[in-house]
Amino acid sequence: MVHPFNRIFGKSDKENIDTDEVEYSTDEVIQIKVDNIHPNRYQPRTIFQEEKIKELAQTIHTHGMIQPIVVRKLEDEDTYELIAGERRWRAVQHLGWEQVSAIIRDMTDTETASVALIENLQREELTVIEEAIAYSKLLELHSLTQEALAQRLGKNQSTVANKLRLLKLPEEVQTALLDKAISERHARALIKLKQEDQQIAVLHEILEKGLNVKQTEDRIAQINEPKEKKKPKPKFKGVNKDIRIAMNTIRQSLNMVSDTGVEVESDEKELDDYYQITIKIPKKNQ
């Protein structure tokens, strides 16, 4: 079975890194000291629920470990880094095991990181911030555009873009999102505020007053309203129907582009002999 890692990043059969095969490999299973294993430095998941680990530990205690963990050897003698199976490794630590069954794989940093990121994304157990970080790392590791990554992961480009935009928020907002103190929709609403101090101030209002998403959006609109009033769109009075249709079509197209996550800036002016629309699109998605 070809793992999505290979379909996504175009690995040949020779370079095949099939994480399903990794889990069920027929290669020799050896015993490695639990204390000699380090967690995957590229692991996007930052929160491991203690209760879930305890439940897994009880299952392993009762039935044994059915699947070995997968590791790669580090430069230090007898030291290994996890590739797959961190929850199982944490569970046997909880049980106080001295050794654990493992398979050793020879993988580069890029391969190790990609396997960890893809596996976690597919299991859909990440928080939105962890998911955003995973997308960001994959973009960097493989020099992909947001559109290319979205296509290879089978997701909408707007989904990837919207998640990545969350990483622009202040650390305090990201922490609140990571801790599930606010929802993703709350966080996406805060992006509409351009000043970091405003974002943090509204975050405090959300937490202190228990604002729902609609109340948060209304509060943000209230803050942005004075700025928006300074730049009213021309009404194009006295123009024929065809020109009005053309102008509205352009506006709708710009809204569609914005919905994909691309930050488009536009300015409309009515001059003596013509109407001018200036559009600015960043060369790189921020």
From Swiss-Prot:
Keywords assigned by UniProt, alphabetized: Cell cycle, Cell division, Cytoplasm, DNA-binding, Septation
GO annotation terms (biological process): chromosome segregation; division septum assembly; positive regulation of sporulation resulting in formation of a cellular spore
Compartments, record wording: Cytoplasm, Nucleoid
Residue ranges of the annotated DNA-binding region, renumbered to this chain: 147-166
Annotated HAMAP family: ParB_Noc
Stated name of the protein: Nucleoid occlusion protein
Pfam family membership, one: ParBc
Domain of life (superkingdom): Bacteria
Function noted in UniProt: Effects nucleoid occlusion by binding relatively nonspecifically to DNA and preventing the assembly of the division machinery in the vicinity of the nucleoid, especially under conditions that disturb the cell cycle. It helps to coordinate cell division and chromosome segregation by preventing the formation of the Z ring through the nucleoid, which would cause chromosome breakage.
One GO CC term on file: nucleoid
GO molecular function terms listed in the Swiss-Prot or TrEMBL record: DNA binding
Organism: Oceanobacillus iheyensis (strain DSM 14371 / CIP 107618 / JCM 11309 / KCTC 3954 / HTE831)
Protein family: Belongs to the ParB family.
